[in-house]
C-alpha cells in the first residue's frame, strides 16, 4: 500500500488539465502510441468539442520513479465546472492529493479556487503546477504570487511544465510521489467503498467507479448499497488503465470498477458506500447527499408525434446522468412535453445539446425557472418549480426565492461594469478583495436572476475575463409576482414568468410588444394582455385585416355605407368568438430573449 498514490487534477476550463492527463498516461505507458488520441479521458464527443470534462474518469498507471521504485498511480479526472461541484467533491474525497494546474499566462480563475477550497476542506494535499510555460505570454512569477495570494498555499517550489510539449511532466510525477501521502485503510476490515461515479454500459449494465477505503472485494461477493439497501452479486472487478482490465480482487487504497448486473443508475448513487452483505460496515462513509436540481425548464417536441421519442431519449440520457429529473407536463400552447430539472445552466445546455445531437430531437424549451417556496394563507408551504403551478395571489402569504452566493473574479478594469450588472440583478455586495491585478467580488444574488442570462452578460461586459462560481445559500422572502400573458382573454400558460414586482411592468410591456410583432395579423382584432392576478399591466392590439366593403358604393347615401360597415363589424365579432390564434414558434423563443434592463 505504501506504493499507491491516489490523486486528481484540479483546473479551470482550458488550463490544460486533460492534456496533462494525456501526457501522464503516455509517460506511464497506459496506452500504446497508436491508441493515444488527444484528451483520452474525455469520452463524450461533446466533452471534446467544448473542451470540458463532464463525467469523472480514472486511470490506474504504473510509474517507475527516479529512485528505482515502482509506484501505482491512480488518476481521477474531475469535472471543472461549477454545475458538477458535487461530482468534484466525490472525486476529491477519494484522493489523498490533488494537482492544482494553473495556466501560467492567465493565473488563478474562479472555478479553480472553488474546487481547490473543496479539496482543502476534505483534507487533500494540494500540489501547485504551472502549465503552459512554453507560451510567450507565460508569467510564472505572477501566477505563483496569485496562487499564494488567493488560495493561500505555499507555491514557491511549484513545478513548471508544459503539457503540450511534455516538458517537465516527469517532474510533476516526481513531486506527486514525494508529496502525496499513501492511502490509509485496512484490507482486513469490513468493506467500505465510495462510489465516485457510475455509468450505464449497454452490455454489462451499470459500471461503478469506486475507491476502496477499507476491506477487500472479489468477484462473486454479494454487495449492498448503504443508501438504498439494494443487494447485488459482483460479476467483475478491475481497474482502468484507460482500457478496462479485470482483476482477481480490489483491496483498500485502490481505485477501480465494479460490475454487478445493476439495471438502473438510480441504484448506484454517486457518493454512496458499498459494503458486503455478510460482513457489513458499521456505518457509511460521510458526505453522501442527494443532488437536488436547481434549475427547471419545460422541454417540448416541435412535432406532437415526437413525444414518445422524446420520452425514450430522456430515459436513455438518465441512464448516464442520475442528476437529471423529468416529469410529463401538458401545456395548452405547446402540447405534451416534460418538465426537466437540472443542476445548473451548463447542465441544461448539455442535456439539450445531447438530445438534439445524439437523438435527433427538435425541441422547444421554455424559459428556465428556479424553485420558489410559497407559504399559503392556510399555513401550508409548497415548492413551485413551474410558473403555471403558482397559486392565486389572494392565497399567498409570502413567496421565498432561492438566494445564491456568487464569487466573481476579474481584472481590475472591469470591476465597475460587473458591479453595475450585479446591482441590476438585485444583488447585495458581501465582500470585495484585491489580489494584485485580480479582484474578487462576493455577492448574494437571487438565483432566478442568475439563471436567465447572468453568465452571458458577465462574459460580454468583461470581454471574457471574468469568471464566476455560485452556491445555494438560503430561501428568502421576496416580492415576486407571476406575470401571465392573455391572448384574446385566454391564458397562454407557456409564456407565464415569475419576476420581481419592480420588473413586472417592464417585463409585461416588453413581452406584449414582442408578441405583437410576431403574431401574424388575423381577420379580427387580437388583444395581447399581460396580467398579474386580475390586474392588467400592459396591452397591445393587433389590428384586423379587413376588406374595403365601401369600394362598390359610388357617392350614395351615408346610411348605405353605415349598414355595410356595421355588417362587417358584426361578422368580425362573430369570427372573434370562434377563432383561435396560432402562436408561432418564434414567439416562444423571443420571450426567452427579452432582456432585463
From Swiss-Prot:
Its main location: membrane. Keywords: Cell inner membrane, Cell membrane, GTP-binding, Hydrolase, Membrane, Nucleotide-binding, Protein biosynthesis. Its EC number is 3.6.5.n1. It is found in: Cell inner membrane. GTP binds at residues 14-19, 131-134. GO terms for cellular component: plasma membrane. InterPro entries: EF-4, EFG_III/V, EFG_V-like, EFTu-like_2, G_TR_CS, LepA_C_sf, LepA_CTD, LepA_IV. It comes from the Bacteria. GO terms for molecular function: GTP binding; GTPase activity; guanosine tetraphosphate binding; ribosome binding; translation elongation factor activity. Belongs to the TRAFAC class translation factor GTPase superfamily. Classic translation factor GTPase family. LepA subfamily. Required for accurate and efficient protein synthesis under certain stress conditions. May act as a fidelity factor of the translation reaction, by catalyzing a one-codon backward translocation of tRNAs on improperly translocated ribosomes. Back-translocation proceeds from a post-translocation (POST) complex to a pre-translocation (PRE) complex, thus giving elongation factor G a second chance to translocate the tRNAs correctly. Binds to ribosomes in a GTP-dependent manner. This is Elongation factor 4.
